[in-house]
């Protein structure tokens, strides 16, 4: 008799915990690793991110189609294994070329997970309020990130390559465990009449395109995601350089100064957990009507805090603005995802979510080199200011999404 698999919601929370732990462990000091071990300059740092986002952009929709046509569970498993291989490659071979190649590998892995995971849990737990599911998953992921940050920072004090390599090995082991326990009981292919791989891809893509065109709220939300992509790569790639070049890191006891980057990530995770709890309580009390205000406030907060982060030079002020910018971005994402989920048909969830991820990547592909060149030719603070301004159009798109969603519901 085969052993009964755990409930999907429990596996989803386990996934968010374990994967966040491993991802944080691998990436908490990755910028420092790229700067101090691989020896990258500001433009190369941004190019690493651009290659990663290009891989995500190229593979995002095809992998979403795979998830909707074949299996969302299988798509998630492939993604976890690719992450493991990518981390091993990046940590083992500290050269610019292999770091770029590693971004392609684990960037492709990310596209297999993005969209498929959200579509899988939304189908398996049909009827549950997805705002709470996604926020609770994000909250647990933030808690796991704390452990990952601690482990990654301690291991990085020994050797900056060690946490990346170990995370890669553990990703492979987690993939094996996940293959045994992850259920998939409510999946039905988006296309019943199959005509071959290429024709199926084309048919589902056209079907999704017609669906999105007929849903103005989805168009607005997808454009908001695109603006978020434009405004994220510069923050991700230049904030570490800003701390190292434009301020003095205080001593951190017996540990070296790079420990501050682990501590910043730790603080960000704690704040993310607390903010998610506040949002869950607000959504339970006020319902989905509060989404518009949440997305508007967090978007405006990100713009203001990032500009203040860019112009500051005192460490404690920079730390406060850095944490605020990261916090607003963290709590904004799951609310937008749940908002989008309410307007997507079940059979097309993974592909629409993947399109959302692709637009995020496309935004980063465009925004990354722009802010990288500004940082290289003028200064890093000006690159960060440029990053913040790229999110401004989303402030005009949020009311459009709210109005369109209201009309569609009526």
Stretch-by-stretch model annotation:
Residues 1-6, 181-222:
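Juxtamembrane intracellular "pre-TM" segments in multi-pass secondary transporters
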Residues 2-57, 217-265:
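Helix-loop boundary and gating motifs at the non-cytosolic
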Residues 32, 36, 146-167, 241-252, ...:
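Transmembrane alpha-helix termini and helix-breaking/packing motifs in multi-pass membrane transporters
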Residues 56-94:
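Conserved MFS/SLC helix-loop-helix module at the cytosolic interface between two early adjacent transmembrane helices
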Residues 76, 292-295:
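Primarily marks hydrophobic transmembrane alpha-helices of the MFS/SLC 12-helix fold
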Residues 81-95, 300-313:
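C-terminal ends and interior cores of transmembrane alpha-helices
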Residues 103-143:
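Cytoplasmic helix-loop-helix junction between adjacent transmembrane helices
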Residues 167, 172-194, 399-410:
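Helix-loop junctions on the cytosolic side of multi-pass membrane transporters
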């Amino acid at each position: 008799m085969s052993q009964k698999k755990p409930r999907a919601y429990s596996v989803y929370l386990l996934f968010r915990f374990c994967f966040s732990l491993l991802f944080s462990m691998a990436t908490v000091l990755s910028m420092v690793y790229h700067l101090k071990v691989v020896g990258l300059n500001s433009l190369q740092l941004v190019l690493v991110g651009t290659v990663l986002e290009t891989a995500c952009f190229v593979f995002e929709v095809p992998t979403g189609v795979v998830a909707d046509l074949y299996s969302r569970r299988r798509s998630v498993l492939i993604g976890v294994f690719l992450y493991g291989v990518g981390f091993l490659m990046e940590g083992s071979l500290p050269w610019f070329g292999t770091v770029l190649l590693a971004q392609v590998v684990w960037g492709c892995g990310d596209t297999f997970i993005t969209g498929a995971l959200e579509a899988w849990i939304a189908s398996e737990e049909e009827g549950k309020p997805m705002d709470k599911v996604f926020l609770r998953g994000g909250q647990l992921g933030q808690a796991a990130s704390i452990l990952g940050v601690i482990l990654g920072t301690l291991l990085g004090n020994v050797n900056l390559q060690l946490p990346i390599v170990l995370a890669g090995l553990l990703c492979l082991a987690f993939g094996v465990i996940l293959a045994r326990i992850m259920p998939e009981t409510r999946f039905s292919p988006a296309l019943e009449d199959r005509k071959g791989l290429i024709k199926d891809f084309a048919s589902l893509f056209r079907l999704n395109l017609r669906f999105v065109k007929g849903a103005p709220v989805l168009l607005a939300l997808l454009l908001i995601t695109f603006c978020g992509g434009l405004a994220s790569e510069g923050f991700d790639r230049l904030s570490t350089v800003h701390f190292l070049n434009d301020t003095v890191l205080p001593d951190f006891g017996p540990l070296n100064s790079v420990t501050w980057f682990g501590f910043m990530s730790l603080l960000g995770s704690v704040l993310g957990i607390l903010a998610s709890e506040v949002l869950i309580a607000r959504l339970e009390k006020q319902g989905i009507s509060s989404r518009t205000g949440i997305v508007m406030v967090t978007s405006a907060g990100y713009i203001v805090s990032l500009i203040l982060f860019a112009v500051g030079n005192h460490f404690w002020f920079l730390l406060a603005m850095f944490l605020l910018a990261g916090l607003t971005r963290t709590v904004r994402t799951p609310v937008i995802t749940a908002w989008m989920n309410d307007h997507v048909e079940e059979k097309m969830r993974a592909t629409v979510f993947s399109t959302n991820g692709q637009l995020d990547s496309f935004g980063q592909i465009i925004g990354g080199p722009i802010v990288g060149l500004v940082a290289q030719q003028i200064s890093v603070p000006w690159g960060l200011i440029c990053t913040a301004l790229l999110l401004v159009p989303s402030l005009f798109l949020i009311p459009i999404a709210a109005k369109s969603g209201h009309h569609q519901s009526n």
